[in-house]
């Protein structure tokens, strides 16, 4: 929802956008808008393009020119966007695995995805002293940004989960994320930095939530408050 939406075309895209585009292809197939052969072919074309993109220690840069495929200045690696992209790669990998008999080279693309995931080193975005992820890495300045994701209710939650699962960062990072509770209109949940649906709900595109869990609790809180705002 945007209150002051501006319609215009920009010749750039981000790592999150690239990953979401892949997931959109899968969603289009699941909803019957596209056939499996066209969907697999489109995903293969997108993966081919990703392999051509310049990267930093396996990470996609935050923004690319869609015509030249060159990274846009200033060159920056976003922790959130990298987490999103790798998360969506796992979805694409699973989708191709389920349909790996349709094309002879599907296994080759699964191998490419595995390599992309493996080469994305999240440890370089992690601050060991605080046990938190930095906002990102300024490649031009060759340093981590001195701001950190310290809340569990954050759009960086997926990046944290994936980095731990890849063993790029220690499990104790998860317990370092703040879990301060709040209550509004009968709903309880965790606080985020700015209370946006983006912070609470973006990771839920991929991450499963279980009934009675803290994740479901703060998801309901955010959904209720968003509904109240729009009424």
How does the language model describe each region?
Residues 1-13, 59-81, 129-148, 179-195, ...:
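Carbohydrate-binding/catalytic loop surfaces
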Residues 9-59, 79-90:
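Long, well-ordered hydrophobic secondary-structure segments characteristic of membrane-embedded
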Residues 19-34, 84-100, 157-168, 202-213:
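Well-ordered alpha-helical scaffold segments within catalytic/enzyme domains
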Residues 33-39, 70, 148, 158:
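Domain-scale activation on soluble regions of proteins
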Residues 89-95, 103-198:
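Aromatic- and glycine-enriched pocket-lining scaffold segments that form the walls
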Residues 219-226:
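Conserved small/polar residues in nucleotide/adenosyl-binding loops
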Residues 230-231:
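Hydrophobic alpha-helical segments, chiefly the membrane-spanning helices
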């Amino acid at each position: 929802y945007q209150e002051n939406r501006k319609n215009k075309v920009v010749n750039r895209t981000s790592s999150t956008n690239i990953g979401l585009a892949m997931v959109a292809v899968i969603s289009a197939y699941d909803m019957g808008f596209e056939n499996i052969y066209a969907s697999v072919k489109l995903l293969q074309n997108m993966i081919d393009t990703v392999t051509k993109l310049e990267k930093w220690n396996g990470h996609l840069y935050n923004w690319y020119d869609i015509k030249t495929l060159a990274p846009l200045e200033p060159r920056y690696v976003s922790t959130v966007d990298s987490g999103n992209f790798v998360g969506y790669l796992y979805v694409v990998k699973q989708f191709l695995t389920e349909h790996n008999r349709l094309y002879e080279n599907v296994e080759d693309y699964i191998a490419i995805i595995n390599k992309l995931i493996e080469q994305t080193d999240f440890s370089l975005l992690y601050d060991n002293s605080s046990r938190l992820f930095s906002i990102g890495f300024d490649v031009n300045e060759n340093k981590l940004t001195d701001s950190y994701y310290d809340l569990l209710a954050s759009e960086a939650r997926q990046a944290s989960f994936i980095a731990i699962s890849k063993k790029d960062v220690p499990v104790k990072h998860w317990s370092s994320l703040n879990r301060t509770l709040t209550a509004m209109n009968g709903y309880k949940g965790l606080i985020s930095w700015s209370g946006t649906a983006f912070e609470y709900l973006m990771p839920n595109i991929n991450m499963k939530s279980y009934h009675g869990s803290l994740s479901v609790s703060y998801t309901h809180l955010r959904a209720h408050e968003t509904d109240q705002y729009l009424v």
